[in-house]
Structure formats: C-alpha cells, structure tokens
C-alpha cells in the first residue's frame, strides 16, 4: 500500500474537507491530493524535510503506525511517559523517530491524558505473546 492510499483511508475517517492550507510539492494533480492535504491539516501526517510527501512510495510500518496513532489521538510525548516493563523490539530504539509510535501501538496500557493532549502510561495490560510472530 502506498503512502497516498493509506492517507486516503485515514482521511476518510474525518468528514471535513481540505482547505488547502497544508500541501506538499509533489502532490499537485495526484488523485489523493485532497485526502493528503486533509490528513496533514489534521496533524495525522507530515511530509519529509524537503517539502515532499512521496505519495507513491510504499508506506513503512513506522509511518502507518504513526498515522494511526495520531488519528486516534494516542500519542505519548516522550519516553518518560512510557513504562520500563513494556514490550520492546530489537528494530526499534529510543533514538528512532518512530520509537514512541511503535511502543504506543504494541503495548496494551492504561493511561492518563495530559493537559496538552499527550498521554502518560499508568499501567500495562496483559499482552498476547508477540514473540510468536517473530521470524
């Protein structure tokens, strides 16, 4: 699935229309332009530092999880909002841009909502044995 296709799926969960205030240099004329712009306006997606979105590139796990978490307003602010006993993944380190998103999506937890809309984890829930999916 491409970044444009995934952005279109996510944007359809919102009934608003794009006002064109958030655009990218490489989406002019693209079939998903309005969806991409709407998802960006909602803060669900951001492009790359060069001002592009790369709509036809395949979406990565990290990008998809980040979009979903933002769409569901499930976002910890920094690693101190997590719990040390959480599941961790060998391909996801605290310095990675997607670390918080992956941890958020793969650890069932209770949380307290902070005033700035971020969340702080208050406890972990029993998780399935994720390691059975490795290899």
Residue ranges of model-derived segments:
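Feature responds to low-complexity, polar/acidic, surface-exposed segments characteristic
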Residues: 1-7, 11-35, 42-62, 71-135
């Amino acid at each position: 699935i491409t970044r444009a296709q995934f952005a279109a799926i996510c944007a359809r969960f919102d009934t608003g229309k794009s006002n064109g205030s958030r655009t990218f240099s490489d989406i002019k004329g693209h079939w998903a332009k309005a969806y991409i712009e709407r998802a960006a306006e909602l803060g669900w997606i951001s492009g790359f530092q060069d001002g592009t979105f790369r709509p036809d590139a395949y979406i990565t796990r990290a990008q998809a999880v980040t979009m979903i978490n933002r769409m569901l307003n499930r976002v910890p602010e920094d690693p101190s909002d997590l719990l040390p006993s959480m599941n961790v993944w060998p391909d996801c380190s605290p310095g990675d841009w997607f670390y918080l998103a992956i941890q958020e999506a793969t650890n069932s937890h209770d949380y307290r909502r902070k005033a700035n809309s971020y969340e702080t984890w208050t406890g972990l829930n029993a998780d399935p044995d994720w390691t059975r999916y490795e290899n």
